[in-house]
């Protein structure tokens, strides 16, 4: 687990997300507290629980992005789920325990990738031997193998086609065991059970020497790895470092005096309670305790209020962070300052057609103004509005770019207003188009 200080975490998030300092600070402290807990010994380590976070703010201001970037930064298993996808146990649909099962799958992939890196050098040598076997046969003399090995390493054989045998990882037939809890835990994979007994199935693939290396290195890495050890490590990582982001939590809040669908909504909240508080979930790899998994919930709370959530669930989300609606200046900074801003993306996309795109400062001001106006008059969808506006402005250039190789387009405020001004003024039209 990374041991960035809260200040470093915030400055890393600043590269991708504009503003929202309170939210960044809250998640930075939460992440640092995970690291602090890892340094504790024995009983105290067990007692320290993560402080779960509730983010409140309109759509498109960076709630999901903050969590996504945080998980990348931490190198921790992370799943993002929509609260609306789940139903109360007993109804048709996914139950909330599936969240933990998904988290374990993510952790296994993470741990396997890390372990593969550790054995990469050895796996590379083994892969080279298998390529030589395919080229000259297993019975070739050492001298022949050495001469071919030199050619291989010089890249002379890259385009030669060879046949290689690799492990067959096809899912094979699987069946559901009736009466087992959860959606996936009861699915036993027959090929998993029989594969070990039969010594593993292989299949032959035709490929070039160059393309065969990644496949063979993965195959050889997996042979060098202890799968049971990976699973045990993944279960530990899930329990100690897992992060779950629950989006749209306001949609399962029962409105005051609301009837009808409220029952199953409240049911989802009730099912979430033990998960957030700490329970043991059965997965096909073994039981997972959720006591130390960090939960970050977020919602716009347009119609409902945080106080409409079940009181017990509110108590289990002790840190409240409010995210602000974006201002004109924020839009400007989103277009210019972020690491992979929309403007940089469009310039890079046009460069693939050998078309140069220049966007002036007054054009950026005009784009920000239009985005703010539309959010105020039509519907506030936050930073996502910029994508709609940019796409509309660059529509003509994107369409004709292949025919204009070598051309340079300068986009200024007049161009932006010409393309979008009339639509933005006509509220009825912009409701449908922008």
Curated annotation (Swiss-Prot):
Domain of life, per lineage: Bacteria
Q: What GO molecular function annotations does the UniProt record carry, in alphabetical order?
A: ATP binding; ATP hydrolysis activity; peptidase activity; proteasome-activating activity
Q: What Gene3D superfamilies does this protein's entry cite?
A: 1.10.8.60, DNA helicase RuvA subunit, C-terminal domain, P-loop containing nucleotide triphosphate hydrolases
| Any Pfam family hit | AAA_2
What InterPro entries does the entry give?
AAA+_ATPase, ATP-dep_Clp_protease_ClpX, ATPase_AAA_core, Clp_ATPase_C, HslU, P-loop_NTPase
Purpose: ATPase subunit of a proteasome-like degradation complex; this subunit has chaperone activity. The binding of ATP and its subsequent hydrolysis by HslU are essential for unfolding of protein substrates subsequently hydrolyzed by HslV. HslU recognizes the N-terminal part of its protein substrates and unfolds these before they are guided to HslV for hydrolysis.
Q: What is this protein called?
A: ATP-dependent protease ATPase subunit HslU
